[in-house]
Amino acid sequence: QLMDDAWQALLQASGGETVGVSLVNPSQADRREVLTVSDRPVLVQVPAMAAKSLTDAVFDPEHPVHVQRGRDAIRMTNGLVDVCIDTRDGLVNSIVDLVSDRELLLSGQRANRLVLHPDYPDCFDAWELQQQYRHSGDPVDRVTDLRVTESLLRAQVRVERHAGQSSFVQTITLDADSRAVEFSVDVDWAERARVLKVDFPLDVAARSSRDEIQFGHIERPIEANTSWDDAHFESCGQQWMLLAEPRYAVALVNQSSYGHDVSPAGGDEHTPTMGVMARLTLLRSPQSPDPHPDQGCHHLVYSLLTDARVESAHVEAARLNQPLQVRSGTVELPSTARIEPVHGTAVIDAVKQAFDGSGDLVIRIHEAEGARSRVRLLLDRDGCVSEVDLLEDPIDEPTQQLPASTCSRVELTLRPFQILTLRVSQR
């Protein structure tokens, strides 16, 4: 209701038309993606923190999707990414980055495999996960139905499964002009004392994972060389996990599945694979204090982003977590604020009115790479920009050299993971 009221206020304030359709981008990233409008896919482009009429936002794809159907395999490709699904088990047996010309899955391995593990913590069922669950697991491989839908903008493979007391519907999606493969699973969950994981055996020689946290990311080792490392068998990240080797990386981006683990994948001392097994924790079913937690239907979404960087991982995370909004009425609103990188990466975390009711605009950003960065902040209005603290009070020793006169563009120099709050005043 709050968003509906805000949209109606925007329509009235901007003199927009009540007919037609507009797209609203609530995120800090420019978006170019396939969106379903009136039950049909369209490729749209909307600037960061802006609104655009649907008519002006639609584009033709540069890399349309094509599907090849074989006896035992279905291949989806858009000229950027090639995905192959084995029709016998509905699992992904190949993901090729066509731009970098490399296979992303370990040889002979399958991705997007659901596995049910026993889950019996010694105590505190709902809060603890113990690594004994790794010693056994039941793959959810049996296919009850498999269907394919395709167009030049989007191809999907839908796989239905049943295991234990639960049913699963997995969907694998490849969109035009996209370097990400999207996965979703609809679960009717009825398990007891089990944990559901999904596997991605990746041919990436990563020594550590970078997991997003608020205002940055944390780097965690993959090899368990110490008892401390061994105790980190399950980690928490927010929207993405980046796995990198020199000159290449992939990212697992999620919508709500924050728990994950990464370990060296397979092989032995004579034939090491140099890859990693990355797994997301999707659902659990502890028995205490609530004997029936999470029972029922769930819709979970995650994606694999090829040739990833911290910046592109943030953009993909915005696509999953801050979807474009389809609104009735036609209005054009420019970007309230956006970041233009010079070198490095910064992310806008908040754009809001000042607490004191002055009408000033407060913008909070952070440096996301963990390195020194230079960026430009572009505003939709002229204003006097000053640096404030988290409570929006002036600071005695500002970190930025900001112009004294009003402007709509400022240069910023950020320290690693620096959080910067700016106030834009019209006076």
Task: Label each residue range with its predicted role.
Residues 12, 17-427:
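C-terminal (or distal) subdomains of carbohydrate-active enzymes
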Residues 2-3:
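Amphipathic alpha-helical
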